Amino acid sequence: MVKLFSYKIKYYLTAFFIIIIQSCASVEHKPLVDGITTAIAPNIIPKIKNGSLFQEKTPINYGYQPLFEDHRSHNIGDTITVVLQENISASNSSSSNLTRDGKANVGVTVTPGTLNPILGLNVNDNKTGIDSIGKNDFSGKGSNSAKNTFTGLITVTVKNVLPNGNLKVIGEKQVAINQGTEFIRFSGVINPNNINKNNLVASTQIADTRIEYVSNNRINDIQKMGWLQRFLLKISPI
C-alpha cells in the first residue's frame, strides 16, 4: 500500500512539472496571412472554332493582349509587384485629477443640564466637540505613442478574380539568414486600374491589406511569453 501511494505521488509530481515546463514555453505564433501563399493558373480548354464570325469567348483569355492596352495582370496566376510604403504613427495621452475634501463637527453634552449648578459648570463647559477631517487626492497621467515603417518590394500572385474585376492577391518571401528564416507574407485586394504600366502597385492603394513580417530564429522565441507567465502577470497585485 505504501509503495502504491509513493508511486502515485511520483506520478502526480512528474505530471505537475511537465505542465509547468510546458506552460513556461513560448506560445505558437498564429499567422496573420494564413493558408497557401501562391496560386496556379487553371488549365483552360479553348473553345473550338466553328467558322462563324462571332466566336464564343473563352472564360479567361490567358495570353491574350489587347492591341491598345498596357499589359496588366488580370488573371489567376499572374504576378504583380507590390511597393510597400507603410508609414503609420499614432499617439494618445490622457490625464485626470480628482480632489475630495470632507469635514464633520459634532458637539456632545457630557452631563445633564440639571447638574450644571451643582458641579459649577456653565453650558459651554459641559460640551465636548468631535472634529473629523478627510481629504482624498488622486492624480494620474498616461501617454502612448507608436510608429511603424515598412518599405520594400514583394511580388504577389493573383489568387482570385472577384466579380467586379478586383484581384485577390497573396504572396510570401522567405530569406534564410544564418540559423533563422525571415518570412514576409502579404495579401489584399487590388483594383486593376491602380496597376501602372510597369506592373507595380503601391501598398497604400490595396484594400484589406495583411502584411506580416516574422522570423523563426531564437531571438524571436525569447521575445515570446508563456501563458502561465502572462496569467501570473495579470493577477499580480504589483
UniProtKB/Swiss-Prot annotation:
The domain of life for this entry's organism is Bacteria
Residue ranges spanning the membrane: these are none
- Which Cys pairs are S-S linked? none
Keywords, comma-separated and alphabetical: Bacterial flagellum, Cell outer membrane, Lipoprotein, Membrane, Palmitate, Signal
Residues bearing covalent lipid (N-palmitoyl cysteine)?
24
Where does it reside?
Answer: Cell outer membrane; Bacterial flagellum basal body
Lipid attachment site numbers (S-diacylglycerol cysteine): 24
Q: Give the signal peptide, or none.
A: 1-23
Look up the record and give one Gene Ontology term from the biological process aspect: bacterial-type flagellum-dependent cell motility
Q: How does the record classify its membrane topology?
A: Lipid-anchor
Q: Which GO terms describe its cellular component?
A: bacterial-type flagellum basal body, distal rod, L ring; cell outer membrane
Q: Which PROSITE patterns match?
A: PROKAR_LIPOPROTEIN
In alphabetical order, the GO MF annotations are:
cytoskeletal motor activity
Cited InterPro entries: Flag_Lring (IPR000527)
HAMAP family in the record: FlgH
Entry's family note: Belongs to the FlgH family.
Please give the function described in this protein's UniProt entry: Assembles around the rod to form the L-ring and probably protects the motor/basal body from shearing forces during rotation.
Kindly state the subunit structure of this protein.
The basal body constitutes a major portion of the flagellar organelle and consists of four rings (L,P,S, and M) mounted on a central rod.
Name of protein: Flagellar L-ring protein
Q: Which organism is it from?
A: Buchnera aphidicola subsp. Schizaphis graminum (strain Sg)
